[in-house]
Amino acid sequence: GAVTQPQKGCSAKGGHSRDPFAGERVTTFAGLLSMIHERVPGIQRLRFVTSYPRDFGDDVLEVIRDSPRICRYLHVPAQSGSNAVLARMNRGYSVEEYLEFLDRARAHLHQPEINRPLTLAGDIIAGFPGETEDDHEATKRLLERARYKNCFIFKYSARPGTVAHEKLPDDVPESVKRRRNNELLALQQRISAEVGREFVGE
C-alpha cells in the first residue's frame, strides 16, 4: 500500500506507528527510504540532506548501506563543539553523542574497498550567544575529529522570532565572531583538502 503521512508519528528508531491525528498507518524514515529505493527504480540516485543526529538510527544507516542507489552522503549539522553552547541552542545532544553517531555512520557506510566511501558534511555557527574562547577551541577540536568533506560555517546573527533572539543577548562582539568564523573556515579548508586527497588515494 501507499505510504501516508510519513512526516507524522515517524520514528527513526523502530517499527511502524500510527498518526495520532488521522489514525493512519505511517512508516519509519528507514522504511520510506527502502520503499522508494525498491519501488521507484527510475530514480538513479537518492540523496537526502540535513539530518538531525539525535534521531538518526542504525536502521537508516543499514538501509543506506544495503541500497546501492542511495548516496553515501550525510549532512549532519553539529552547530558547535561545546556542550555548553549546544545546551543553550537546545540541540538535545552532546558533543560525545554526536561524535559517537559519526563513528557509527562510518562503521556502517565507509567502504572505500568497494568504491563506496562515506562523505560527511556539517554545519557550524561561530559566535553564538555566550560562546567563550574555550567553546571556540572545542569547536576546532570537533572539526578535527569529525573530518567533514565540507562544512557550512556561518557567523551567528540574531533572527527575530527565534528563542535565541528573544532570550539570549547577542553578546559576542562582531569582530570576535568574524575572527572565529575565519579561523574555522581556514581549518575546515585544510581538512577538506586532506579528506579530498584521502578519497583520491582510496
Task: Name each model feature, range by range.
Residues G1-E133:
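Conserved SAM/AdoMet-binding glycine-rich loop
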Residues R72, A84-E202:
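A structural motif corresponding to the C-terminal lobe/cap of the Radical SAM core domain
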